[in-house]
């Protein structure tokens, strides 16, 4: 259902990544698809990619999905000039089914800058805040509750699997010891300090913070991100008209491998990018968070059904 909880005073400022990389394949679509066609932005965020496409293609319409109320408010403000061409839906993309097929389905899987930069969201180890990490702050288990519930071996396995962290067992041991001795961590800074202490002193001050992989793992687990991505990749091809475009921007190898495999093996899709597109040096200089972005495209084949998928 359309979102009725939007408040335009959002304070949500986000710089979208790889806008040109997304817009160019859309511009190359057949003209008949672009006339009156529908875009489904599965991760609307602040609405940057969608605003660009709506501006460049006046006949396109948009359905934007996001489970974060702050993001929806920002997108509503940014996209207001497009009027009834825009519908914003308060949902996770795994729970959505469109009433009509789209010419473009896109998903930007990254955590937005406002989510990272607001301490209260609990995503960042650089800003002290509660250990939350939920994309939808009204639903589900927090990171603090997760690390309290898991056994040490389960926590170690999670940090290794979702963070690709080689010191996962040492980190899990430290976390569970701290919780037993001191009670819950005061916030993200305390957890980051504990994780950094598991590294040798010389490894604590590199370009990548020692807590990066552990925080990634906890965020993925809290939001069930990889399972949600797998379900999206299964459903999204059926949201498209024949010849429609599926675009996915990922930010770490666990996501990109899934997208690559789905685009290669799904018989409903024709892979358009053998290797992912990456941000230019100019964009990285302007927006350092684009450094890890990878964008892949696929086209919906005609007369393919869900049975043709993996």
Swiss-Prot record:
It is found in: Cytoplasm. One of its GO terms (molecular function) is rRNA (cytosine-N4-)-methyltransferase activity. InterPro entries: RsmH, SAM-dep_MeTrfase_MraW_recog, SAM-dependent_MTases_sf. S-adenosyl-L-methionine binds at residues 47-49, 66, 93, 108, 115. Its main location: cytoplasm. One of its GO terms (biological process) is rRNA base methylation. Pfam families: Methyltransf_5. Gene3D superfamilies: Putative methyltransferase TM0872, insert domain, Vaccinia Virus protein VP39. One of its GO terms (cellular component) is cytoplasm. Keywords: Cytoplasm, Methyltransferase, rRNA processing, S-adenosyl-L-methionine, Transferase. Belongs to the methyltransferase superfamily. RsmH family. This is Ribosomal RNA small subunit methyltransferase H.
């Amino acid at each position: 259902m359309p979102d009725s909880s939007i408040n335009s005073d959002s304070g949500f400022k986000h710089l979208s990544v790889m806008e040109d990389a997304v817009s160019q394949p859309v511009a190359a679509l057949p003209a008949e698809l672009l006339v009156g066609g529908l875009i489904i932005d599965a991760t609307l965020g602040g609405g940057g990619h969608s605003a660009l496409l709506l501006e460049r293609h006046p006949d396109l319409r948009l359905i934007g999905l996001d489970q974060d109320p702050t993001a929806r408010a920002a997108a509503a403000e940014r996209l207001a000039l497009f009027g009834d061409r825009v519908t914003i839906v308060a949902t996770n993309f795994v729970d959505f089914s469109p009433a009509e097929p789209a010419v473009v389905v896109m998903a930007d899987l990254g955590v937005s800058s406002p989510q990272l930069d607001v301490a209260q969201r609990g995503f960042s180890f650089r800003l002290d805040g509660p250990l939350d990490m939920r994309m939808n702050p009204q639903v589900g288990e927090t990171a603090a509750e997760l690390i309290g519930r898991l056994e040490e071996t389960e926590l170690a396995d999670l940090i290794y699997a979702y963070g690709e962290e080689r010191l996962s067992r040492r980190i899990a041991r430290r976390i569970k010891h701290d919780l037993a001795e001191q009670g819950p961590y005061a916030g993200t800074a305390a957890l980051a300090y504990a994780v950094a202490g598991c590294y040798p002193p010389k490894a604590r001050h590199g370009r990548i913070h020692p807590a990066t992989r552990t925080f990634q793992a906890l965020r993925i687990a809290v939001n069930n991100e990889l399972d949600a991505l797998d379900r999206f990749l299964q459903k999204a091809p059926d949201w498209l008209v024949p010849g429609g475009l599926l675009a996915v921007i990922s930010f770490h190898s666990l996501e990109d491998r899934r997208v690559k495999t789905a685009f290669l093996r799904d018989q409903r899709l024709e892979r358009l990018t053998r290797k992912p597109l990456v941000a230019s040096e100019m964009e990285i200089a302007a927006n350092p968070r684009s450094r890890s972005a990878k964008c892949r495209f696929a086209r919906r084949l005609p007369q393919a059904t869900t049975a043709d998928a993996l």
